[in-house]
Regions:
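Flavin (FAD/FMN) cofactor-binding and adjacent substrate-gating region
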Residues: 72, 90-166, 172, 302
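Dinucleotide-binding Rossmann-like beta1-alpha1 core, especially the glycine-rich loop
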Residues: 46-123, 236
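Glycine-rich FAD pyrophosphate-binding loop
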Residues: 22-42
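Conserved beta-strand-loop-beta-strand element in the redox core of flavoprotein oxidoreductases
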Residues: 171-183
């Protein structure tokens, strides 16, 4: 029986641990805090699950597969995780990323509709399409209860035989030290999220930023799944209908300030709140002046081109590094775990797109660059 240590029980690490133990591996899952904890990027209330990824058929297929696996996890665990609200994309131009997304979605057989701006009124109780060229609607997309999903993944992994260890992990060559206990396995995967770059300074190049989210009090009729989740691609704002009474979520999607996940307070920016409010007033007029009922800040960890990091350690052949998923982790986590399992079992070859080498700056939280077709 092959053995693995997975460090980090977020969506990447937890999904991999569950995948491996379900496939007959002996698995130890290490996490410094309880799964779904508020310090992590995987600890939020909701995450968009959608397949549109511009011209990238690889990411589109991965996201579609991940949704299948989330639904499978629901059936196996009995948990209610995915909310089929649909996702509406707002575009101000007829070509570019939106047009490429529509083309690839249709090629991959993913349901998608191209709507005129005025048709947004059938999706939302109050909608102003001023400045939009079109709406791209993914009816089978939706929202995942992220914190719940993270917890369920770890619970299922333990139920299937994984050992869960709580503590601070330190790399020691091809072993792991957890609060003085030395752990060994055939494969070690470090999936430390916002902490990964600090664990491997000089090897892992990730920028960690603080991303702020705002929840507004909305009248009846704005609940998810009654209204679709939404993304204004050119405006750089996204949101989710009121899920589980938390409030109507709206957040600017621009990269936030650099952030230390251990030392800094998680206090949302007043400037970003004003941007969110301005957008609500523009696009959903009835929500202008809606009261702020909640906030959250979470760390994002991003590579320079926003593709994932999936690479062997340059000095230790049994050690792998997995990260750079913030903004995309839940869209791909279970499917990426399948890919990583293939790498660990030497059934797949590492792809330089996800490697440790230099990457061109650019990309964006919504539109990763990728050369793999």
């Amino acid at each position: 029986m092959p053995s693995a240590i997975v460090v980090g029980a977020g969506v990447f690490g937890g999904s991999l641990a569950l995948r491996l133990v379900s496939s007959g591996w002996e698995v130890t899952l290490v996490e410094q805090y309880p799964p779904g904890h508020v310090r992590a990027a995987s600890g939020g209330e909701s995450r968009l699950i959608r397949s549109a990824h511009g011209a990238s058929s690889w990411y589109t297929r991965s996201a579609r597969r991940a949704l299948e696996l989330w639904r499978e996890l629901e059936r196996e665990s009995g948990a209610d995780l995915f909310v089929p609200s649909g996702v509406a994309w707002f575009f101000s131009k007829p070509d570019g990323w939106g047009a490429e997304s529509e083309r690839v979605l249709r090629e991959e057989g993913v349901p998608v509709e191209r709507l005129a701006p005025e048709e947004g009124a059938r999706l939302y109780p109050s909608f102003d399409g001023t400045g939009l060229d079109s709406i791209l609607y993914e009816p089978e997309a939706g929202v995942l209860r992220a914190r719940d999903a993270t917890r369920v993944i770890s619970e299922q992994a333990v139920e299937r035989g994984a050992r869960f260890v709580t503590g601070t992990a330190i790399p020691e060559g091809e072993t792991v030290s957890v609060d003085g206990e030395r752990l060994e396995a055939d494969r070690i995967v470090w999936a430390g999220g916002a902490w990964l770059a600090g664990i491997f300074p000089g090897i892992v190049d990730l920028r960690v930023t603080r991303q702020d989210v705002y929840f507004f009090g909305a009248p009846a009729g704005w609940e998810s799944p009654s209204v679709p989740a939404w993304v204004d691609f050119d405006g750089g704002v996204y949101g989710v209908g009121d899920l589980d009474g938390r409030g109507f979520k709206a957040s600017p999607d621009s990269e936030g300030p650099d952030f230390d996940p251990d030392a800094e307070d998680r206090v949302p920016s007043g400037e970003k709140e004003r941007e969110a409010r301005a957008y609500l007033a523009l696009r959903f007029p009835v929500l202008a002046g809606a009261p702020l009922v909640g906030t959250r800040s979470c760390p994002y960890s991003l590579t320079s081109d926003t593709n994932f990091l999936v690479a062997p350690h340059p000095e230790h052949e049994r050690v792998w590094l997995l990260g750079g998923g913030s903004g995309h982790g839940f869209k791909h986590g279970p499917a990426l775990a399948e890919y990583v399992q293939g790498l660990l079992e030497e059934k797949e070859e590492p792809d330089s797109v996800f490697g440790l080498g230099a990457r061109p700056p650019g990309g964006g939280l919504r539109a990763p660059w990728i050369e793999t077709s």
